[in-house]
UniProtKB/Swiss-Prot annotation:
InterPro entries, sorted: Ant_C, Phage_regulatory_Rha
Manganese in keyword set: no
Superkingdom of source: Bacteria
Entry keyword annotation includes Zinc-finger: no
Assigned keywords, A-Z: DNA-binding
Name listed for the protein in its UniProt record: SPbeta prophage-derived putative antirepressor protein YoqD
Gene: yoqD
């Protein structure tokens, strides 16, 4: 299990994002949403407060569409975990219990914002203010780069759930990283082959489920096409980030 949960504080509640939960437990986000909708309906029918478990919200995908997701409280995570069996359920439980406890300890140890500002002079307050804004921008950037594992690519996927490299470039939306530059970047980083079989993926990345290679008949013969899975697109985003290529996030 390579995914990790991020616990956030919102209006005094500690929450995790259903998109991260779906990735961690190996489910499509749409399937998890369907399950949560079912849990919410049962809770409401029993006249229980569903907001103590799940808080419905929206986010914008790479194309600007508003899509549904949920924030899960610790109780909500308990409910999802209770429906799971096997190693994924155990690992998910271990992750969210640990992350919630870490966040709770951090909040208890954190001095109040008012106390902090009272101890500062005017210059220090200004520095603290802009430092906090910078931290928020960096957090937003991280969330954007890590966002919607399935929904992010929906409009670019073909009927087999695959994308061409040019479609990946459009989906991730990094300035200056169009199709040709993305091909070049992947060749330079030994993800795609340079030379014979140019732009075909190395076998180890095919075996990891990042790429598929298809053949297509053209007027000049058979052409080989490299296609990317959603998992492969996320791998490419992480690789770009590692090499300093980031989306421009508005302040």
């Amino acid at each position: 299990m390579e995914s990790y949960l991020t616990v956030i504080e919102q209006n005094g509640q500690l929450l995790v994002d259903s998109r991260e939960v779906a990735e961690m437990v190996g489910k499509r986000h749409t399937d998890l949403l369907r399950s949560i909708d079912g849990y919410v309906a049962i809770l409401l029918n029993a006249k229980l407060r569903s907001v103590e478990f799940f808080l419905e919200s929206t986010y914008k995908d790479a194309t600007g569409r508003s899509l549904k997701h949920f924030h899960l409280t610790r109780k909500g995570c308990d409910m999802v975990a209770n429906k799971m069996t096997g190693a994924k359920g155990v690992l998910f439980t271990a992750q969210y219990v640990s992350k919630f406890e870490e966040m709770e300890k951090a909040l208890k140890a954190r001095p109040s914002l008012i106390d902090t500002y009272l101890d500062m002079n005017e210059d220090e307050r200004a520095i603290a203010y802009f430092t906090e804004r910078k931290a928020k921008r960096e957090l937003q950037e991280q969330l954007t780069l890590a966002e919607p594992k399935v929904e992010k690519y929906d409009r670019f996927l073909n009927t087999d759930g695959l994308m061409k490299i040019g479609q990946v470039a459009k989906a991730i939306g990094i300035k200056g990283m169009g199709q040709n530059n993305l091909f070049r970047f992947l060749r330079e980083n030994k993800v795609l082959i340079d030379g014979t079989n140019k732009n075909a993926p190395y076998q180890k990345y095919v075996e990891r489920g990042f790429f598929q290679v298809k053949t297509q008949e053209t007027s000049v013969g058979i052409k080989t096409i490299t296609l990317v899975t959603p998992k492969g697109a996320d791998f490419i985003v992480d690789l770009l980030k590692k090499h300093g290529h980031k989306r421009e996030i508005a302040s």
